[in-house]
Amino acid sequence: QWIEIVSYSRKTYSDLKIYVCVYEHSTIDFIESLKIDGYKLNSSDLSNPLVLDKVALKNKPINLSVGASTILEIENAIKRIKDISNSNITLMYGHQSFPTKPENVHMSFMNKLAEHFKLPIGYQDHCDADNDSGFWLPAATLGMNISILEKHITHDRSKKGLDHESALNPLEFIKFVEMVRCIESAKGMPSVRPFTKEEVRYREFQKKSIVVTRDIKKGTILNLNDISFMRAEKLGLAPDKIDQILGKTLLINKLAF
């Protein structure tokens, strides 16, 4: 079945990355024969040298689950992998309760993990799929600059299969992915960018410019009583340039704005 599933997935979704969650070291050679893209290791195997070593020697990306694990356990697992491998490691954090109550998610701990280990962080969601929090809470973790968002999917949650508490039905999963993509788009990039055409238009009618408040003849020496800061259809001289015109002689007749 696994051979058929992987083959179908690759043919149907050419850009799909296939990661396999490993629980037994004896299955790794078979998994490798499927030509997968990477491995996920359960937090129960953070101290399992047989699984850690065999997966590490494949030199493929590793998603390392760290839920309900100590900092020392995580450090030891990372060191063991790095000592024998060039695998890229992503730490996958998630509260290990099914379903997870929002107050137990402890989302900010992902920042601590990222700061301490200097590695990419992913979030494993186990929130109640029968509740709105099963949608918005995992989506909210995108604001924590995670690299991977793990969400369970099931054919039918009502049948109560493995991890059904947090698993979305297919149509729900489609909606969830749409939500995630929307948030990703909204996040943008952490860099200065050119104004959009909407922002340019906003600047034109919202930003204030220096204008004259009455009809003034040329030769007049401008003072504060002659000018004001107002919105105009097009940007003129910005208010912070007022010192450039106060006390200067007007060279042309100027009508009040």
Describe the role of every protein-language-model region:
Residues 1-257:
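Catalytic cores and adjacent flexible loops of soluble metabolic enzymes
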